[in-house]
Amino acid sequence: MINLPKNCVVFTYPKMGDSGKFLPAELRGAAGLTGCTLQCKAYESAFAQIKALGFELIAVGSMGEAGTSEFKRATGATFEFINDEKFELEAPLWLETFTTGDGKKFYHRQTLIFRDGKEIKRFSRIAEPEQDAQNILAALRNL
């Protein structure tokens, strides 16, 4: 199990690349399956405010070490990224996943807020990734 900080925001991103061509019929056209880069850049812009509120920020994806490192570099993100290609967080955090027609598994876009090591808020299947960071900042301010 991956250890998370006691106070943190964890968001999962699908970043499917070419596997997006093989989405199952029920997910084709679903909101929120694209926009990983925009979401990460928005979180980078909000990172200082999230830290000032006493929370760490962690992005979780399943791209492999090299893909995760390259994606983090490409977005200019300074917060932590976790490569969870073995889906070690799926069961303990009750994270939703999906599988594409080419047999690859991904996390749905979700954001969880933890305080004192306990999940206190969850946002599932985020439809507007570029708005997620601002929505989370509002939620953190209202805790």
Name each model-derived stretch.
Residues 1-143:
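Chalcogenol-based redox active-site neighborhoods
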